[in-house]
Design a protein with these regions (language model features):
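Acidic/histidine-rich catalytic neighborhood of metal-dependent amide-processing enzymes
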Residues: 1-70
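Generic serine detector
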Residues: 7, 15, 23, 44, ...
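Conserved active-site and cofactor/substrate-binding residues in soluble primary-metabolism enzymes
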Residues: 13-20, 91-99, 122-125, 158-165
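Alpha-helix initiation/capping motif
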Residues: 15, 32-33, 93, 113, ...
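Structural signal for hydrophobic packing residues in well-ordered secondary-structure cores
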Residues: 22-30, 55-56, 101-104, 108, ...
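Short C-terminal domain-edge/linker segments immediately following a structured domain
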Residues: 26-32, 76-82, 143-145, 169-173
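Active-site-adjacent substrate-binding region
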Residues: 56-59, 63-152
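His/Asp/Glu-rich mid-to-C-terminal helical/loop segments that flank catalytic regions of hydrolases
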Residues: 143-173
């Protein structure tokens, strides 16, 4: 909740609400050990299912064309998200990126490696860095969007279907 305003507030990912929720789940199954929540996070894997900034041909100068999400080319994997270099960011480790690519390749998931924009021009944040700071292996994985946050946004049905297949494959593995 509240990702668009920095994940702050009493229900944002920066609050304790998520930790409390996971702790309550553990209590419901009667599992209670010292440092259990930390262990759960450190043994977890996550796809941060947020959208990616697709290349806008009218504003191509804000994209790094060698590393940009292209609409119609499948779901985007963003190893690194953030803005202004590596400030307030998440940078997935190489082993986790390789794991995700392996399961996507084995299941014929169409994906592309991308970033949110040129350093100091584009960029943006997701909740990935918050979970990464808790020890979760996480990578941003979402549909490229043309004109993100504009009154009209455009996505590709193929990319949406690719996302569906990617998320299903992730849960099965």
């Amino acid at each position: 909740d509240k990702e668009e305003i920095g994940s702050m507030g009493n229900t944002g990912m920066e609050s304790h609400v998520f930790d409390t929720f996971i702790s309550e789940l553990l209590n419901k199954v009667r599992i209670n050990r010292p440092n259990l929540l930390d262990k759960v996070f450190c043994n977890s894997r996550m796809l941060s299912a947020d959208v990616d900034a697709g290349v806008d041909p009218l504003y191509a100068q804000v994209s790094d064309m060698n590393n940009a999400g292209i609409i119609g080319e499948g779901i985007s994997l963003n190893k690194y998200t953030g803005s202004g270099g590596k400030y307030n960011s998440s940078d997935a480790n190489a082993e986790y990126v390789a794991y995700i690519r392996k399961i996507f390749n084995e299941n014929n998931i169409k994906y592309q490696l991308a970033e949110l924009g040129k350093v100091d021009i584009g960029g943006g944040g997701t909740i990935a860095y918050i979970l990464a700071n808790k020890g979760v292996d996480v990578i941003d994985c979402g549909v490229p969007v043309l004109s993100m946050h504009a009154p009209y946004e455009v996505t590709s049905k193929y990319d949406i279907y690719s996302a569906y297949n990617a998320y299903e494959t992730f849960f099965k593995n």
